[in-house]
Amino acid sequence: MAGDDHLISGLYAITDAHLMPEPVFLARAEAALRGGARILQYRDKGDVVTDARRRRMQAGALRELCAQYGALFVVNDDPRLARVVGAPALHVGAEDAPPAALRAQFGRAILIGVSCYGSVPQAQEAATQGADYVAFGSFFASPSKPQAPVVSVDVLTAARAMIDLPIVAIGGITEANGRALIAAGADALAVISGVFAAEDVEGAARRFTALFNNRKE
């Protein structure tokens, strides 16, 4: 989806099954969108076979919600689900299919994001293979991934100088530390607990969004 790089900016909210149990799943997702989330990723680690129907229904509903709010919908780690629900974007990790293989499968019909953890060379390779954006982190201790290694904020500065793609920062991001990541070069902040663990999801999303509204150009 050439020309859509501008879609990767602002608050990038990521769903969590524990923080968003099924009875309130869509309501909490919509609250984040009302609060200004520009991107919403469906991240669900349920079994792709036994949970297939639920995953398909949730992903399809999120795609419709995102379209209603003008936000980008992303499926995490599941190319088949992305195709089934017509997701406009797919995010993968280092263990998943490489960007070149996904690009061959989907063509330019989908945005592809790649987790690069703390590796700028890995991000450069992803860019060469056709990725549309790259993600780095965890930058801080993360309640969602407590075992994830913490990487230096300097990675963002180095990547910004060497890679001509939108950059997403992830991992333990809060309203207090997010501004420094934006200043270092992050185009978007990917947040799970900071948004969906909040009692007021919409309010939390608005505060994260304000970090971008208030940044110096």
Swiss-Prot record:
Q: MF terms per GO, please?
A: magnesium ion binding; thiamine-phosphate diphosphorylase activity
Q: What is its EC number?
A: 2.5.1.3
Give the superkingdom in one word: Bacteria
A GO BP entry is:
thiamine biosynthetic process
The name this protein goes by in its record: Thiamine-phosphate synthase
State the reactions this protein catalyses. 2-[(2R,5Z)-2-carboxy-4-methylthiazol-5(2H)-ylidene]ethyl phosphate + 4-amino-2-methyl-5-(diphosphooxymethyl)pyrimidine + 2 H(+) = thiamine phosphate + CO2 + diphosphate; 2-(2-carboxy-4-methylthiazol-5-yl)ethyl phosphate + 4-amino-2-methyl-5-(diphosphooxymethyl)pyrimidine + 2 H(+) = thiamine phosphate + CO2 + diphosphate; 4-methyl-5-(2-phosphooxyethyl)-thiazole + 4-amino-2-methyl-5-(diphosphooxymethyl)pyrimidine + H(+) = thiamine phosphate + diphosphate
**HAMAP family referenced in this protein's UniProt entry, alphabetically:** TMP_synthase
Which biological pathway?
Cofactor biosynthesis; thiamine diphosphate biosynthesis; thiamine phosphate from 4-amino-2-methyl-5-diphosphomethylpyrimidine and 4-methyl-5-(2-phosphoethyl)-thiazole: step 1/1
- Gene name as annotated: thiE
